[in-house]
Amino acid sequence: MIIKSIELQNFRNYEDLNISFDEGTNIFYGDNAQGKTNILEAAYLSGTTKSHKCSKDKEMIRFGEQESHIRTVVVKKDKEYQIDMHLKHNRSKGIAINKVPIKKASELFGILNMVFFSPEDLNIIKNGPAERRRFLDSELCQLDKIYLSDLTTYNKILNQRNKLLKDMVYRPDLKDTLSVWDMQLVETGRKIIRRRKQFVDELNEIVHDIHYRISGEKEDLLLQYEPSIEDIFFEDELSRVKERDMRQCMTSVGPHRDDLLFSIGEVDIRKFGSQGQQRTSALSLKLSEIELVKRSIHDTPVLLLDDVLSELDSNRQNYLLNSIHDTQTLITCTGLDEFVKNRFHINKIFKVVQGTVEERKEI
């Protein structure tokens, strides 16, 4: 699959922009804070309905304007899709596929699969469990609409249970209703735990091989799913900690407390790995993500690289660039030295200056 073009109106610092992409490598270069990342954000938003930078639509609307429009044309298995997205202040975003409005955002998922790689992703190993859960959920929601539905349901039930726990401080008589939410939480939570475990097992096979090659055949990386409770024990554990949950007014066990273990040998590199090991592992994880998406959808996802090359040494740069030759890639960077040095083929080059984009014919 490829993104054929993107049109932006009043999106971030762009008043009116129309870009046609090559099916190979597309590079956007320029100084910081010129609008390079905004183009990648618009692409990611078109496929996932979410921004990697903010949670509120109004933050993406150009200053002084009331609404924003994004039109993305995607070609997938010889079929063309036009995705229109309207962002407005204090209103839910409007989405249409081939000019037909959709009622649920989940209807969009699966049309445009992407892998987003930014400098922040290099810290996924050393950051807290929430970042690693966000990674799991982001990838699974793109690939599995049932998982997306289950996760949405689980979060709603979790919020209701937590609200009830807080209300019980003043209304002890509400305790009898807690079991209703517990049953629903366990039923949905078990599905999430099982699907995450399956996903991590599949990902581990790929990440091990890739990391072994990147590390010069020196390191064996193991990726393991760490649920806060095994699915078969979820109901019993939730009952066991009920009094504690009531005191703390929060749900202390469940998939919302899960984690991913990254280990090399017997070493937990989340805590004890060197920066080099953590960054190489993060790169291995992202490259594995591309391969797993390929296997899952029998197509190649679009790769978005947001100023990540400057954070990698020359060996990792080289490995990354050589791994994406058959993938449509949108890259942002401040300069082109890495590509010249690595003799990397570039299909299209765009110079970005203060919200204007100019295509260049050569480096």
Describe every region a protein language model picked out:
Residues 45-57, 288-296:
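Post-Walker A helix-loop "phosphate-sensing" segment adjacent to the P-loop in P-loop NTPases
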Residues 48-125, 129-131, 140-143, 147, ...:
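Nucleotide-state sensing region of NTPase/ATPase domains
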Residues 35-36:
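Conserved lysine of the Walker
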Residues 1-31, 171-302, 311, 315, ...:
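Conserved NTPase motor "head" modules and their coupling/switch loops across ABC/AAA+ ATPases, GTPases
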Residues 306-308:
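Walker B catalytic acidic pair
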Residues 106-114, 118-183, 187, 359-360:
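A conserved P-loop NTPase coupling/switch region
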Residues 72, 328-335:
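Structural recognition of the conserved hydrophobic beta-strand(s) that form the central parallel beta-sheet
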